[in-house]
A protein has these predicted regions:
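N-terminal secretory signal peptides that target proteins for export/translocation
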Residues: 1-16
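Non-catalytic pre-domain segments flanking phosphatase-related domains
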Residues: 17-75, 81-132, 166-179, 454-464
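C-terminal cap/substrate-recognition subdomain and adjoining C-terminal extension
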Residues: 35-43, 48-54, 62-64, 68, ...
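Ordered hydrophobic segments in well-structured contexts
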Residues: 70-72, 221, 385
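Intrinsically disordered, low-complexity boundary segments flanking structured domains
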Residues: 78-79, 219, 304-308
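Generic structural signal for well-ordered beta-strand positions
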Residues: 80-81, 387
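A metal-dependent, Asp-based hydrolase signature
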Residues: 85, 92-94, 99-265
Length: 464
């Protein structure tokens, strides 16, 4: 992360321009008459937010020289309501769209752990407790793997292998609808969710530890092991299109038999039109736009293309979790070496080690995020705007600090960074932005998740 200001006498000319412009920005960034042609409007955003962003666009030459200005966005729950990795998980299971063989199931989803290996995330290796069954009895990773693999084997032999031509002598005698009525499918649906979400939560009490970040960023991508790049692109595009037409739901299923566990999913996606407007405005002002996502890079890139953002955010401007293919070009779920995990500190590393070099050492002038994994990236902004989607995270999360800054510096800028901080509310029932910094989980009660500054009353903008 960059320090605030270098001494002018030691600064290069481009840096000196940024330093000298800092004082001017505080006045222009929030001025209602900063530019006569400031017509920036992002759909469903508060007028206050639009004014602040519009004034940044109108005055960008005051804070950045040619080639220096750029913006960084998260993708999941920032550009869209919902998470493309989580919703594609539901879609994959609902369609039994897999490629890996049943004999590889346990080795794939053990994530490299065994009974004798351990770290702070899985202190007893595969004998670590993953969660509890419906009776409150502990379930180990080893048990969850073994039980889920048994159901997968039946589904693979009966439907998956013949449907995707994975073996030479298999013929399917059942349709997808028919196989989904079997006990094996119903149990697999619950168990695989219990297994993967259980693994994702195994952070040893430190979600920034190396093992926690690796597990969280790779556990769901293991579902696509064995797929070609074209199959992956088809899967994610089909999943997004299907989820856009679905209700926003979190269905929960329960398995029966020897392992009775609950497994939950999320389904349904919505695109935030205001983010597209913002990206278009940034590009029109000469500001390059980047996406830094914790989803697999191929997922974020395909999502952007599907929504027609390719001209604003070209493929080379999308950074996500990167994985190695095998010699046949098939997906492996093995992380690319010497490349940061694009969550938390890894997002900031993309900014400081890659993007700043491209943009003559300048930090970003705009960032938008929604959760803990975005905080470090959002903290790299200087002389610009930080726009936070308000998902009502409590003050145990670093993202709540950005809610508080939006309230504390409402109508002004933060002295140390010279940033304006915005809070974007949302209606979580229908998955849209609303013209407030407050958000609602039920369409009835609206709140800011901030206790200071009179509960952030200045950002309400609603007649409640």
């Amino acid at each position: 992360m960059r320090t605030e200001v270098m001494k002018c006498e030691a600064a290069e000319p481009s840096t000196m321009v940024r330093v000298l412009a800092a004082a001017a920005l505080s006045a222009t960034l929030l001025a209602s008459t900063a530019a006569a042609d400031n017509f920036f409007i992002a759909a469903e955003a508060p007028d206050y937010n639009n004014k602040v962003v519009g004034n940044l666009l109108a005055n960008i030459s005051s804070v950045r020289g040619p080639g220096e200005a750029y913006a960084v966005f998260d993708w999941d729950n920032t550009c869209m309501f919902g998470d493309i990795s989580y919703t594609s998980f539901y879609y994959q299971v609902d369609n039994l769209n897999f490629r890996f063989a049943p004999e590889d199931f346990e080795s794939i989803f053990s994530l490299g752990y065994n009974a004798s290996s351990s770290d702070i995330c899985l202190t007893n290796g595969t004998n670590s407790v993953l969660g509890q069954d419906v009776n409150g009895t502990d379930v180990t990773l080893a048990t969850a793997l073994s039980e889920t693999a048994q159901d997968y084997k039946v589904l693979y032999e009966s439907y998956i292998a013949p449907t995707y031509n994975l073996t030479s002598n298999s013929t399917s005698n059942v349709t997808l609808d028919e196989i989904k009525e079997t006990a094996e499918y119903l149990n697999f649906r619950a168990k695989i969710s219990f297994l993967l979400f259980g693994l994702e939560a195994m952070d040893g009490g430190d979600d920034h530890s190396q093992c926690a970040m690796k597990i969280a960023m790779t556990v769901f991508p293991h579902l696509i092991v064995g797929m070609t790049e074209d199959e992956l692109k088809t899967l994610i595009r089909s999943s997004i299109r299907w989820n856009l037409g679905q209700a926003l739901e979190e269905p929960t299923y329960t398995s029966t038999g020897d392992l009775a566990v609950e497994g939950s999913y999320t389904k349904g996606l919505r695109f935030f039109n205001g983010q597209e407007s913002t990206m278009r405005g940034l590009r029109a002002a000469g500001i390059d736009v980047y996406i830094i996502s914790a989803s697999p890079q191929i997922y974020a890139a395909e999502a952007g293309n599907l929504f027609g953002l390719g001209n604003m955010v070209p493929k080379d401007n999308v950074f996500g979790v990167r994985f190695k293919p095998d010699d046949a070009g098939l997906f492996t779920a093995e992380l690319v070496e010497n490349y940061p995990i694009t969550w938390g500190p890894g997002k900031a590393t993309i900014v400081t080690s890659i993007l700043e070099e491209i943009h003559q050492g300048a930090p970003p002038v705009y960032s938008s995020g929604d959760t803990t994994g975005d905080c470090e990236m959002m903290n790299t902004v200087r002389d610009g705007v930080v726009d936070t989607n308000n998902r009502l995270k409590d003050n145990s999360s670093c993202i709540n600090d950005f809610y508080q800054k939006a309230c504390e510096y409402f109508g002004t800028t933060e002295p140390i960074t010279n940033n304006a901080y915005l809070l974007q509310g949302q209606d979580q029932v229908i998955g849209t932005w609303i013209t407030s910094g407050f958000s609602t989980k039920d369409g009835v009660t609206y709140e800011s998740a901030v206790t200071a500054d009179n509960g952030c009353a200045a950002y309400q903008f609603l007649d409640l």
